[in-house]
Amino acid sequence: MQQDKQPDYHPVVFRDRAAGYAFLTRSTATSDKTIEWDDGETYPVVDVEISSESHPFYTGKARTVDSEGRIAQFERRYGSTGPGSDGGGAA
């Protein structure tokens, strides 16, 4: 077997800047920035824009999407003018 084929797997801190939340895990991600963690050790830190602490799905602040169908929405806006309706049409 060939040696050194696997990427370096090491402890990394991921920091959610929006929520002010950070967690220590193991990853192959690298960074030049470091942070001192609660245990006194220094770890590389990777800043992320969104995590489970700030994502609307996990925080319960998700917007509800209108589930009305496109055909129903069209008919509501413009009315039903198909065959058999009172809207007229070709005679």
UniProtKB/Swiss-Prot annotation:
Domain of life: Bacteria
Keywords assigned by UniProt, alphabetized: Ribonucleoprotein, Ribosomal protein
One GO cellular component term noted in the UniProt record for this chain: ribonucleoprotein complex
GO terms, biological process: translation
Alphabetized InterPro entries for the sequence: Ribosomal_bL28/bL31-like_sf (IPR034704), Ribosomal_bL31 (IPR002150), Ribosomal_bL31_B (IPR027493), Ribosomal_bL31_sf (IPR042105)
Entry's family note: Belongs to the bacterial ribosomal protein bL31 family. Type B subfamily.
Assembly: Part of the 50S ribosomal subunit.
Protein name (record): Large ribosomal subunit protein bL31B-1
Higher taxonomy: Bacteria, Bacillati, Actinomycetota, Actinomycetes, Kitasatosporales
